[in-house]
Amino acid sequence: MRHDGRRPDELRPLAFRRRYTRPPAGSVLVRMGRTTVLCTCSVELTVPPFLVGTGKGWLTAEYAMLPGSTSPRKPRDRAGKIDGRSVEIQRLIGRSLRAVLELEKLGERTLWIDCDVLEADGGTRTAAINGAYVALIDALTSSSALFPPVGQVVRGSVAAVSVGLLGNEELLDLDYEEDKEAEVDLNLVMTGAGQFIEVQGSGEEATFSRSQLDRLLKLGKLGIDAITAKQRDALGASWPLA
């Protein structure tokens, strides 16, 4: 039994609150346990210079932790002084969502994903990806005058979860207390169809075997399936896949 009473293979409580703010085309507040992230998707009618004249669109992401999301306070990211971790995570979010997008179907438009962490208790990057996918679908749906039907633009779903080894036990969806003590920590990004988008993993003063890696990947897949089901429930009739 884990310190919060969960089973080793149990996710933290997960909830998506859609249309959380009005200005963006898509806006979702996602909670995974105490970790809370506001994910928005905005449409810009231009593309980066390298895509001008190609007829192809783009998706990019920004990620930040608000100063009060942690204790002690985290200094705010500023232009010219962006946390290297934030840069890594926002690139991960962008790559993850582009993996299931038909960018040619967007026309010369950019989808901006913004993920702001309101409270951090481990797994902020995975929560951000999970919420960003829901915000993306809402943005495409609410901007139907600009884009083809969502099912033609999006070819799969995206979900992310952490897994780790703590005391030689495989755990799903680590919170901060578990993450800081874990001997091995992996972040998985997968499609709902079970295809890998990204695997990030490392030992923390420890090594792990191929059989342990295989078990962690299997455990992560169980988590991805459960998260995908929650995304489907949250989107309801807006779910883009057959």
What is each stretch, according to the model?
Residues 1-242:
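Polyanion-binding surfaces on beta-sheet-dominated domains and ring/shell assemblies
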